[in-house]
From Swiss-Prot:
Transit peptide: 1-19
Named cofactor requirement(s): Zn(2+)
Tissue: Highly expressed in the germline.
UniProt entry tagged with the keyword Acetylation: no
Enzyme nomenclature, EC number: 3.1.26.11
Top-level enzyme category: hydrolase
General function of this protein: Zinc phosphodiesterase, which displays some tRNA 3'-processing endonuclease activity. Probably involved in tRNA maturation, by removing a 3'-trailer from precursor tRNA. Involved in germline proliferation. May be required for both mitosis and meiosis in germ cells.
Region called Disordered, residue ranges: 624-652
Transmembrane segments: none
Protein name per UniProt: Zinc phosphodiesterase ELAC protein 2 homolog
Subunit note: Homodimer.
Organism: Caenorhabditis elegans
Record has Ligase as a keyword: no
Biological classification of the source: Eukaryota, Metazoa, Ecdysozoa, Nematoda, Chromadorea
Keywords carried by this UniProt record: Endonuclease, Hydrolase, Metal-binding, Mitochondrion, Nuclease, Nucleus, Transit peptide, tRNA processing, Zinc
Length: 833
């Protein structure tokens, strides 16, 4: 009996296997879409299985291998699909009919120098600073469409935004090519494991291809780019401090771009004369192929093309960033540039990203004299340009908030700027041969006759916001309270540079908080990408320099990039601030764990040494027993249930001799282990006599409640709205209700909620229970004196009225989610029955 059952089971399995094999074969032949869906379902199923097993288990390794094989199969199918839909690279169809230079950032305000070369088919980006991904939408460009990134010099200002660009892409996106500078891919791989779990994966979705300057050139159907490496002579005996810090392989790269000749236009009259029938034959002629007509005649493409040449073509562009005068000499000596210096050829555009200090040298003036030709347009994008508040969402949103609470939201720099920003040249400034360009400006290299795109216009004219009568009444009542509020304690002062979780949104940047203990002492808690740009908008150029000189310490809660990707910029700008103000340099104290230090060491090795500018206080917790402990295999350190260092740590004991408690006005600083990543911390500090607690990213944490007892103010993350407890638990974050509960148990006098998911771009959900306590909701650019803390909670009724449309949309989404969950629950119940 048992033997019969066994034979029957084997036969059934064989039948099922045959069915699956034939089914899979049919799918590959007939329907790629169904195959992809099937593979995705199997990956999801294997992921669920994987979660049930430890990563060290044999079953886990088998499932991992299965997922990897399935991914390769899916990638192969997607590659075939793309090949079927994309025209060949050498096809005349791929030659762009329009090409324009468009300035994303001119080095001032929120964004460092960068621009794009735009065609209808592709987007080429030159340098990718912090916040580039956040503000690409200004030019109606999705970061997913950026395939080619050209890096003129391997410094942080040029590469800081690349990881955000990569993370924003879909898994089936084309590979991203990094042109020019070396070691960038190596650095990106180093920081990859420290992306926030909110991204869903710590792997970059698209492949990255590095094309260093040693490859000499790049060519596609639209243009040819020649890499011109600029390597100054290496002075072994140089005592120059900068030459000691810059790595030998940091070569500047100039790019010579030459557009392919524009596609010739088909002359309809010639088609009629030659009696070419309508249909696919005309398409082949347009693609440059000869065709045979039904009557046997062979028609060559030249017989039907128009003899008119495209007018206004400016096909040659040179992009340069020379960091020193020696790099300029290398550019002049370059063999690729000799035809232009000798007058044999003429450039049409030259984009200068070099600093003014280099541009004003005799060598650079000599270069300009050699290239002196009225037909060349010299575009200068180097930070010395007009300061224009081009980011409409940031400035208009802050103006709205300032109209509500002027004491809490400062005017952003440039103060009192008002106007309309277009892609024309009205806001540029001419200086000798140069045009100092403004953000968003556009210059045509080729303008097709069919161009009919709606112009981009940012309206930043000073105007009263449109508010309801109820909102105006609430604002009037609030401003009356503002005048009556006592002003007896200015410090400590809190500034919120970023209040978004994981990724920046249109109205919110990622995490960054400033605590000013006095006029001469400041501390930064977390430094997400774009923090320096936000700081520059709040304090202005001169105020920012003074603030950086006053900055004594940076505290990093954990190593996710949305909490530390702006750190390198702060370090570099702080050093420049000391030099600019003529003050002796004072090392910056960096309090962090070892995961923050790993990418920093890689950056120092690959690009520029910054470790000597810091005094590091490592607050890592090592969940390992010392060597030689009993209870494990020889040579292996077994894990303990808890770290051998205490979960709460007095950081002041580990400070160097440069720490001055009186000057810093810092009497207490504790790092408290919280529930996020393995070495994530919250911070408890007593600044200027007041107790402030920063939760960092965490689930509700009892230890933080205990250590932060009776805090004057708690700044707690509130990533999710209530009802998302499962998401919060899975991603190790807190809901709004959980954050408020932590504050109540801590007996905090004031609670400010922050770190909202990007699904709440302007304002999070504002439940009524927030009104019962001193609870406020942080917005970017909120700058609050200590005696103004009671005012923050009074803004909630105004926000409900001002952002009524946004809150209504959030309510609709919540109801839809509840309904969907209910339907799924009912279906599961029916299946079980």
């Amino acid at each position: 009996m048992l033997g019969a059952i066994a034979r029957k089971t084997v036969e059934n399995r064989i039948l099922v296997s045959r069915h699956l094999i034939s089914s899979t074969s049919c799918l590959f032949k007939d329907n790629n879409e169904e195959l992809l869906e099937s593979i995705k379902e199997r990956i999801a199923r294997n992921r669920r299985i994987l979660q049930k097993h430890s990563s060290s288990h044999l079953k886990a390794r088998e499932v991992n291998a299965s997922i990897s094989n399935l991914r390769q199969s899916m990638a192969a199918v997607q590659k075939k699909q793309k090949a079927a839909h994309e025209p060949p690279a050498n096809s005349i169809v791929n030659i762009p009919s329009q090409v324009s230079i468009e300035v994303l950032g001119n080095g001032t305000g929120l964004l460092r120098a960068c621009f794009i070369l735009r065609t209808p088919l592709k987007t080429y980006m030159f340098n990718c600073p912090e916040n580039a991904c956040r503000f690409l939408w200004q030019l109606r460009i999705r970061s997913s469409s950026v395939v080619d990134l050209f890096i003129t010099s391997a410094n942080w200002d040029n590469i800081a935004g690349i990881s955000s660009i990569l993370l924003s892409k879909e898994s089936n996106a084309l590979s991203t090519r990094l042109h020019g500078a070396m070691n960038i891919k190596h650095f990106l791989e180093c920081i990859r494991p420290f992306q926030d779990s909110d991204y869903g994966s710590c792997k970059y979705p698209s492949q990255v291809e590095e094309r260093p300057y040693t490859m000499e050139n790049y060519e596609d159907a639209g243009l040819k780019v020649t890499y011109i490496p600029l390597s100054p002579p290496l002075n072994i005996g140089s005592n120059n401090e900068k030459s000691k810090n810059v790595k030998v392989n940091n070569v500047d790269i100039a790019f010579l771009i030459e557009m392919k000749e524009a596609a010739r236009r088909i002359d309809t009259m010639k088609l009629m004369e030659l009696k070419v029938p309508k249909g696919p034959l005309i398409g082949k002629l347009k693609s440059g192929e000869a065709v045979t007509l039904p009557d046997g005649r062979t028609i060559q493409p030249d017989q039907v093309f128009s003899s008119d040449k495209v007018e206004g073509d400016k096909p040659l562009l040179l992009v340069t960033e020379c960091t020193t005068e020696d790099h300029v000499k290398a550019l002049i000596d370059s063999s690729s540039l000799q035809p232009f210096l000798n007058g044999e050829k003429q450039l049409d555009y030259m984009v200068h990203i070099s600093d003014d200090a280099v541009i004003n040298t005799p060598t650079y003036r000599h270069l300009m004299e050699k290239l002196n030709n009225p037909s060349i347009t010299h575009l200068l994008i180097n930070g010395g340009n007009p300061v224009i508040p081009a980011v409409e969402s940031v400035y208009k949103h802050t103006r709205l908030l300032r109209s509500i609470a002027p004491s809490l939201f400062p005017a952003l720099h440039p103060i009192d700027w008002s106007g309309i920003i277009t892609q024309n040249e009205e806001l540029s400034q001419r200086q000798d041969q140069f045009i100092r360009v403004a953000p968003m400006q556009r210059y045509w290299m080729r303008r097709g006759a069919s161009f009919n795109e709606e112009p981009i216009v940012n309206n930043l004219l000073a105007a009263e916001p449109e508010l309801s009568d109820k909102a105006k009444e609430l604002i009037k009542e609030y401003q009356k309270l503002e005048k009556e509020n006592k002003m007896d304690c200015e410090f400590p002062k809190l500034t919120f540079f970023g209040t978004s979780s994981a990724v920046p949104s249109k109205y919110r940047n990622v995490t960054g908080y400033l605590v000013e203990a006095s006029e001469n002492s400041a501390i930064l808690i977390d430094v997400g990408e774009g923090t320096y740009g936000q700081m520059r908008a709040v304090f202005g150029e001169d105020g920012c320099k003074q603030l950086l000189v006053n900055l004594n310490c940076v505290l990093i809660t954990h190593a996710h990039q949305d909490h530390m990707n702006g750190l390198y910029t702060i370090i570099a700008r702080r050093k420049e601030a000391f030099e600019s103000l003529g003050a002796p340099y004072r090392p910056l104290v960096l309090v962090c764990n070892r995961n923050v230090l790993k990418p920093m060491k890689t950056y120092s090795i690959c690009f520029e040494n910054i470790e000597h500018l810091l005094e590091i206080v490592d607050i890592s917790r090592y969940p390992l027993t010392p060597p030689g402990s009993p209870g494990g295999p020889p040579g292996k350190r077994p894990r303990l249930p808890s770290p051998h260092l205490p979960p709460s740590r007095d950081v002041l004991q580990d400070m160097s001799s440069s720490f001055d408690k009186k000057a810093w006005k810092l009497d207490e600083l504790k790092a408290v282990q919280v529930h996020h990543t393995r070495m994530a911390n919250g911070f408890v500090m007593r600044v200027a006599g007041k107790r402030i607690v920063f939760s960092g990213d965490t689930k509700p944490c009892d230890l933080l409640v205990e250590e932060g007892k009776d805090a004057d103010v708690l700044v707690h993350e509130s990533t999710f709205e209530d009802g998302h407890e499962a998401d919060a638990m899975r991603k190790r974050h807190s809901t709004m209700g959980q954050a408020v509960d932590v504050g109540k148990r801590m007996n905090a006098k004031h609670i400010i909620l922050t770190h909202f998911s990007a699904r709440y771009p302007k304002v999070p959900v504002l439940p009524e229970y927030l009104d019962k306590e001193n609870i406020g909701v942080a917005m970017d650019m909120l700058r609050v004196r200590f005696d103004h803390l009671p005012l923050v909670s009074k803004l909630l009724p105004i926000f409900r009225e001002v952002f009524v449309a946004e809150l209504f949309e959030l309510t609709i989404k919540k109801e839809q989610r509840v309904l969907k969950d209910k339907e799924l629950s009912e279906k599961r119940g029916q299946l079980k029955a």
